[in-house]
Amino acid sequence: RMEWSKDSRHVVFQHLNRLQNTNLVIQADVRNGRLQTLLVDRDDAWVEVVEDWHWIENGRRFLWLSERDGWQHIYAVSRATGQITLLTPGAYDVIRIAGVDERLGCVYFIASPDNPTQRYLYRATLDGNGRVERVSPEDQPGTHSYEMSPDCHWAFHTHSRFGQPPVIELVRLPEHKVVRVLVDNAELSARLAELKPCSVEFFRVAIGNGVQLDAWCIKPPDFDPSKRYPLLVHVYGEPAGTTVA
């Protein structure tokens, strides 16, 4: 993975070793071939290649996703000095960077510190003071996704949760003011309400060493706890996605 600097005098690239446990971010001066290592991500087991680069301050720094402290967080990296600043401290994973508003001095990102089965929009300041605040409405549990305008003043916001079809809105940021409802799925919601719903239970399974995995169970509409039923178990054990949300 490589990108040109804003002044086209440098190429900044990732160098991932064959074992995929060390990732270097290197800056190359195209005029003299001089190399400068800006960042080293290393893990005893595995390091993932980073797709989510965001240049800020006219190319003087870039935002980087890293699991260097055990959680995936956003770091700001200086091209001049290699200084690395943590922007999103805490015991949770940043799912992705949604956008950067340099006018307000903040980065928007998707995460869910309290419930990993859900997704919300947060923002953190670019100066590294550790302030993080939730932007998605507090009264809307579930999954939120955003497609932001380049200046991060507007976004297409999609919200859904189990049993509720997606609602798509145009919102104004940072106040998350709804400007227009684009898709309300009212007809689909009404039809779903006419159906006999299944009983759904969300729970966690302890797998040892203090680790708990999220799970969910769907029971038949006429479920009788005194009876025996066939059981279908679906397990996804890889790190690339979620099936409980």
Predicted regions and their residues:
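Serine-hydrolase catalytic core recognition
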Residues: 14, 136-137, 144-245
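WD40/WD-repeat beta-propeller blade-loop signature
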Residues: 7, 93, 142, 211-212
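Beta-strand C-termini and the immediately following turn/loop, strongest in propeller blades
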Residues: 4, 12-19, 26-29, 55-69, ...
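Extended, hydrophobic alpha-helical segments in both membrane/secreted and soluble proteins
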Residues: 8-11, 21, 34, 49-55, ...
